[in-house]
Amino acid sequence: MRLFLSLPVLVVVLSMVLEGPAPAQGAPDVSSALDKLKEFGNTLEDKAWEVINRIKQSELPAKTR
């Protein structure tokens, strides 16, 4: 009975080993990563300028002088 159950398991394991390594999942593209980084930088810059302009237009600088 043990031999009867272990043979199918052995066949499955052997087929998995002989199949070889799995193909790599989509390799990350360097240019798309750089584009995302550039977009993030531009967004951050826009938000920073927005905050600076809001501070300049507020009464806070006049009150602190």
Curated annotation (Swiss-Prot):
One of its GO terms (molecular function) is phospholipase inhibitor activity. Disulfide bonds: none annotated. It is found in: Secreted. One of its GO terms (cellular component) is very-low-density lipoprotein particle. Its main location: secreted. Apolipoprotein C-I is present in acidic (APOC1A) and basic (APOC1B) forms in P.paniscus, P.abelii and P.troglodytes and perhaps also in baboons and macaques. In human, the acidic form has become a pseudogene. Residues 1-26 form the signal peptide. This is Apolipoprotein C-I, basic form. The keyword Kinase does not apply. InterPro entries: ApoC-1_sf (IPR043081), ApoC-I (IPR006781). It comes from the Eukaryota. Belongs to the apolipoprotein C1 family. It comes from Chlorocebus pygerythrus (Vervet monkey). Transmembrane segments: none annotated. Pfam families: ApoC-I (PF04691). The keyword NADP does not apply. GO terms for biological process: lipid transport; lipoprotein metabolic process; negative regulation of cholesterol transport; negative regulation of lipid catabolic process; negative regulation of very-low-density lipoprotein particle clearance; triglyceride metabolic process; very-low-density lipoprotein particle clearance. Keywords: Lipid transport, Secreted, Signal, Transport.
